[in-house]
Amino acid sequence: MTDLFQEPKDATPLAPEERDGLRLSWVTTRADLNVAEQDNIDKGAAWAFRARRRDMLTVDFVLQLHKRMFGDVWTWAGHYRRTERNIGIAPYLIGVQTSQLMGDAAYWVQHETYEPIELAVRLHHKLVFIHPFPNGNGRHARLMADLLLQRLGVPALSWGGGSLNDLTALRRAYVDALRLADREDYEALIAFAQS
């Protein structure tokens, strides 16, 4: 038996039809998948930081970034999820809520509603809360936050300074901070993002 689709306890497992979207036949273990995804994420991040797009707070960019981060590994990369999850909103609301979030974030930037770090952390949290994709939501949202900070002339966040992919105390602190942010308490998530 392979551990390929074994997720950390607090992660959202892929539906069978989403698992079928794996493009790489050589990926047979979780470690293989982690390597393949990280290589793809690195390519996507390099593209995004080079692009320096002014219009990054758009649905089109949200989808394009996810595709650039995961498209070499998954056929569904850059497409909204169509399956229910134990976290996130109903699939039929994803497009509307993502569009609304991008509009809100553009407003926050234009009107300096929040300090840059809080603004980026709120964008990250709301994207994770919506959970638009079958997988990679946290990694995508953290990169969106860092890209926004770059646009605002602020250094990227450290997000705890380690891997959040495995079940560790670091991931537990991250998930706990996200849950507090679900109740509009952003203090712990802001602190975590800067640690």
Per-range role (PLM):
Residues 1-195:
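FIC/Doc superfamily catalytic core
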